[in-house]
Amino acid sequence: MKVYLHDVNRGLGVFLLAVSFLLPGCSSSGGRRASVPVTVDATAQVVEQARQTWLQEHPNWSFYGRAAIRQGSDGGSVRVEWEQHGRGYRIVLSAPMSRQSWVLSGSSSGPARLEGVGGWVRVGEVAEQVLFEATGWQVPMGLLPDWVRGRNSDSGGGDVQLDAEGRPHRVYQGGWQLRFLDWFPSSVGRPMLPRQIEASRGSARIRLIVDQWDELIP
């Protein structure tokens, strides 16, 4: 995964913030807007249920994308690459202009490892805590793999508003609000997947554009 940040001195912190917003994550920006009820017909409900089933049955995937990030008056852009193998993940970040790079890897059921330029390593049992100690950011790593694919979270507790196709349109969970702005159409052997996602929480804003989705071989 490659990351390009205008402010490289804060690259890791901004990137990790970006990742937390990227994934079908929720974001909350000071309150929910009143929503207009959407009618989802029976056919769309069946298609969406089939999509959710497919996502559950295909836990190995990766995506490449771009994100615009803003935290208060600070902003930048990033390249993102994420690989997920079931419960395990590996995220590689690099800022070519500053020659900085980071690798975050681990599992939702095991320890997380964060490696940075110069060989420093931080390891912990909980990914959220590892990232917080390194950056000061709270990143809901346990929810991101579901959010980024528009999958109903196994952890529950969220509020999901659907579009006319029966897909997630807005998601509110864990203090985050997420909006799905565009989707890749379904193709042979693969259902619709998010193409453009916008997330916000307080003064933080992220817009993710996914360039490519891939299914990984176990």
From Swiss-Prot:
The gene is lolB. GO terms for biological process: lipoprotein localization to outer membrane; protein transport. Its main location: membrane. It comes from Xylella fastidiosa (strain Temecula1 / ATCC 700964). NCBIfam families: lolB. Plays a critical role in the incorporation of lipoproteins in the outer membrane after they are released by the LolA protein. It is found in: Cell outer membrane. The lineage of its organism: Bacteria, Pseudomonadati, Pseudomonadota, Gammaproteobacteria, Lysobacterales. InterPro entries: LolA/LolB/LppX, OM_lipoprot_LolB. A lipid is attached at residue 26 (S-diacylglycerol cysteine). Keywords: Cell outer membrane, Chaperone, Lipoprotein, Membrane, Palmitate, Protein transport, Signal, Transport. Belongs to the LolB family. Residues 1-25 form the signal peptide. A lipid is attached at residue 26 (N-palmitoyl cysteine). CDD domains: LolB. It is a lipid-anchor. This is Outer-membrane lipoprotein LolB. GO terms for cellular component: cell outer membrane.
